[in-house]
Curated annotation (Swiss-Prot):
The entry's keywords: Cytoplasm, Elongation factor, Protein biosynthesis
Residue stretches in coiled coil: none
Entry function: Associates with the EF-Tu.GDP complex and induces the exchange of GDP to GTP. It remains bound to the aminoacyl-tRNA.EF-Tu.GTP complex up to the GTP hydrolysis stage on the ribosome.
NCBIfam families per the UniProt record, alphabetical: tsf
The family this protein is said to belong to: Belongs to the EF-Ts family.
Keyword Lipid metabolism: no
Protein name (Swiss-Prot/TrEMBL): Elongation factor Ts
Family annotation (InterPro entries): EF-Ts_dimer_sf, Transl_elong_EFTs/EF1B, Transl_elong_EFTs/EF1B_dimer, Transl_elong_Ts_CS, UBA-like_sf
Location relative to the cell: Cytoplasm
Recorded GO MF terms: translation elongation factor activity
Keyword Protein biosynthesis assigned: yes
Amino acid sequence: MTAITASMVKELRDRTGLAMMECKKALTEANGDIELAIDNLRKSGQAKAAKKAGNIAADGAITIVQDGNKAVLVEVNCQTDFVAKDENFSNFSNAVAKAILASGETDAEKVAELKLEDGQSVEEARIALVQKIGENIQVRRAKIVEGENLAVYKHGLRIGVVVSYTGSAETGKGIAMHVAAFNPVAVSAEAVPADLVAKEKEIAEAKAIESGKPANIVEKMVSGSVEKYLNEVALDRQMYVIDNDKKVADVLKATATNIVEFVRFEVGEGIEKKAEMSFAEEVAAAQAAAK
């Protein structure tokens, strides 16, 4: 009997998109033969899910579910915006979000094992949806936000924001809209991750040195570039989306509002998409997928 290693399970999971436990079970039944495991999966009820798993799922939707002082943002990916608008896809995304919020679990592998209201696991429901719709579908990430007050904002299907705040409800809602539009990195300049500041400084130094200016001038140029960067990415330094004459910091002060935390999800962040297909290629791909 071949020993089933973690690397074997990971390889099968990467190739099929199935949960770790499903992959381990398939490998055990195939005595460690990955290709045989995939063949067996394709012969089973997971056939279409296994076949579609190699397709890049960079479209999709952000779903937000709130319950009192807790809210969850979930990104579920598919391959096309057409499927992202499908009622079955939307129902699945909402069911997953509710299960995550109820359990408090956001780890991808454990989320796959959560039970939905109809008794299916998330993974079972995902596979069934892949078989029904014909696209690769993945629950990519989730984040739970808790706070005294929460403001929720969605821009279509692709962007979702949850803001935890104290103070004015109107300002909280405005900040959620602002975060969706301006995509700040942190609440304040001091909270911007040090590695991002260091990277910006390194780039600024390289440009300044190329200018051939004296060292003291180079130092000022670098300082100015870093300051400009912080003004662009720190929430409190940005110009307010609802009133471009005011900085966010001024609006927060005037309304006695404090931003504790914000989370912004945008569909497909960090996922490399394939080049757009022509209409003829899309038709050919659809015909191939239907076989």
